[in-house]
UniProtKB/Swiss-Prot annotation:
Substrate binds at residues 163, 192, 249. This is Homoserine O-succinyltransferase. Gene3D superfamilies: 3.40.50.880. The active site is at residues 142, 235, 237. Keywords: Acyltransferase, Amino-acid biosynthesis, Cytoplasm, Methionine biosynthesis, Transferase. Transfers a succinyl group from succinyl-CoA to L-homoserine, forming succinyl-L-homoserine. Its EC number is 2.3.1.46. It is found in: Cytoplasm. The keyword Transmembrane helix does not apply. The gene is metAS. Pathway: Amino-acid biosynthesis; L-methionine biosynthesis via de novo pathway; O-succinyl-L-homoserine from L-homoserine: step 1/1. One of its GO terms (cellular component) is cytoplasm. PANTHER family: HOMOSERINE O-SUCCINYLTRANSFERASE.
Length: 313
């Protein structure tokens, strides 16, 4: 099934060239199917690139998805035109009264800044709090995962001396969660961050479940026991070139970054990168959307109390 996007969104041309099924709002209006309504809070600098990455994953699922793009209303984007933002993005006040099947909150280049010092932290907290009553399931990515664990569950992160960048092997910690259906025993996922969460604190928290971890990269998948919040510590949405682009950017800024691990062939930054995580990323988002959104969300979104708990399925 397709992902439904606004008419003329730039990502459409890229996705269609990759044989990803997308549908314009005009075309979708002629179908009598209840789509999944997903809101994306895009905090990444390059909005169009991140839109494309996330829509690529949503477009590979068997469900029709109706996407709204959300911005922090008083924060200008330095890397995306005002025209694009005004055309395709909504302010929170425009969606506050609505309910959604799913919410995706992206990462942000804020890894070394205390949460309380982030300029728009109050807005992030407000949106997270709102989501707990207005969204069936929330997918937090990278920085947003740390922010969500801090705000909702009081967990603190540890700032790393060096940026953790690369593609790392992960393992499931359980066989029994619908989110992990189809996962290999070990799988790859990319990371790009300056902080990490304490694995033992996650394990000991009564409201959280650790579903996947890595010896090198630490906690990766964490699910709240009420199934509402999924925290992904890495970037399964990244395209093949993203880690290289970040590495080259850091080099150009004189930051002396470490070479992304397990990413370039033979760990040589002059060689080609190897994408080992795309199938995992597609399966992760597909399972989330199917098992934690579609199968739990009420048909009538105006009644969020009608969510179906897993125990009754």
């Amino acid at each position: 099934m397709p992902v439904r996007i606004p008419d003329h969104l730039p990502a459409a041309e890229v996705l269609e060239s990759e044989n990803i099924f997308v549908m314009s709002e005009t075309r979708a209006a002629n179908q009598d199917i209840r789509p999944m309504k997903v809101l994306i809070l895009n905090l990444m600098p390059n909005k169009i690139e991140t839109e494309t990455q996330l829509l690529r994953l949503l477009g590979n699922t068997p469900l029709q998805v109706d996407v709204d793009l959300l911005r922090i209303h008083d924060k200008e984007s330095k890397h995306t035109s005002i025209d694009h933002m005004n055309t395709f993005y909504r302010d929170f006040e425009a969606v506050r009264h609505k309910n959604y099947d799913g919410l995706i909150i992206t990462g942000a280049p804020l890894g070394q800044i205390d949460f309380e010092d982030v300029v728009y932290w109050d807005h992030i907290r407000e949106i997270i709090d709102w989501s707990q009553e207005h969204v069936t399931s929330v997918l937090f990515l990278c920085w947003a995962a740390h922010a969500g664990l801090y705000h909702l569950y009081g967990l603190n992160r540890k700032i790393l001396q060096q940026k953790r960048s690369g593609v790392f092997v992960h393992r499931r910690t359980s066989q029994h969660f619908p989110l992990l259906r189809g996962f290999d025993d070990e799988f790859f996922a990319p990371h790009s961050r300056f902080a990490e969460m304490d694995v033992e604190e996650i394990r000991q928290h009564p409201q959280l479940q650790l579903l996947a971890e890595s010896d090198e990269a630490g906690a990766y998948l964490v699910l709240s026991r009420n199934n509402r919040n999924l925290f992904v510590m890495g970037h399964p949405e990244y395209q093949k070139s993203t880690l290289n682009e970040e590495y080259q950017r850091d080099l150009s800024q004189g930051l002396d970054p470490n070479v992304p691990q397990n990413y370039y062939r033979n760990d040589d930054p002059k060689a080609d990168a190897i994408a080992r995580w795309h199938s995992h990323g597609s399966l992760l988002v597909s399972n989330w959307l199917n098992y934690y959104v579609y199968q739990l969300t009420p048909y009538d979104l105006s009644d969020m109390t009608a969510m179906t708990p897993w125990e009754s399925r």
